């Protein structure tokens, strides 16, 4: 048992965790890095927030998803999708942007990663801020109905509407309630999740897209408009 512990949890050979081996300090342990439980259940996705220069200022490019798609047809979003096996979130964001906007890799400059979002349904979304060079409003008709742009400044000057949703736990029918204190009356924790809406003449920008925009707009407002 001791050999397993020092192989997995300590830096120095033949030493185990503090309290078991005399004289070991906490700084001498800790070679193991924390992983993530049930990571195989987490769906990973990545999106690119594409910027273009238009009229002397930055615009954000949006897609309207094709009506023929099974998921979220007609919704406004950023180019992006699932992170495939063997690729990084950044690579996924670039690949999806190339496929959906029909542009080349040399037309995309990834500027920086934005804050990762954890969405309901065990989904992790990695957004990246990027700049498009020579974009001519092309898109894949199989995935996109049309594209449009909105000045980034507009989002910095307009706060989105915020609505709160409640997340509840619903056990499956075969759940062994008899083994849980309180049975079917067990008090499950409830979560709360904010949903944002931007209302534009082009359509409603909401959900994860709006949440990413809100975060980007705050940075833009603090770094640019406040100066």
Please give the residue ranges for each predicted region:
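Acidic, glycine-rich loop-and-strand cores that form catalytic or ligand-binding grooves
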Residues: 139-174
């Amino acid at each position: 048992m001791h050999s397993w512990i020092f192989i997995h949890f300590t830096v120095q050979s033949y030493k185990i965790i503090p309290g078991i081996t005399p004289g070991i300090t906490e700084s001498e342990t800790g070679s193991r890095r924390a992983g993530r439980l049930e990571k195989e259940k987490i769906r990973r996705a990545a999106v690119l927030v594409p910027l273009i220069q238009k009229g002397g200022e930055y615009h954000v490019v949006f897609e309207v998803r094709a009506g023929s798609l099974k998921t979220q047809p007609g919704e406004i979003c950023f180019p992006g999708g699932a992170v495939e096996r063997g690729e990084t979130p950044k690579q996924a964001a670039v690949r999806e942007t190339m496929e959906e906007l029909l542009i080349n890799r040399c037309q995309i400059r990834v500027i920086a990663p934005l804050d990762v979002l954890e969405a309901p349904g065990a989904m992790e979304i990695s957004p990246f801020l990027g700049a498009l060079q020579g974009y001519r409003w092309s898109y894949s008709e199989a995935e996109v109905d049309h594209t449009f742009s909105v000045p980034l400044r507009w989002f910095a000057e307009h706060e989105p509407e915020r609505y709160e949703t409640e997340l509840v736990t619903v056990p499956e029918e075969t759940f062994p309630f008899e083994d849980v204190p309180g049975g079917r009356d067990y008090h499950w924790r409830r979560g709360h999740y904010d949903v944002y809406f931007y209302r534009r003449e082009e359509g409603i920008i909401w959900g994860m897209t709006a949440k990413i925009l809100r975060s980007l707009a705050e940075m833009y407002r603090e770094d640019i408009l406040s100066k």
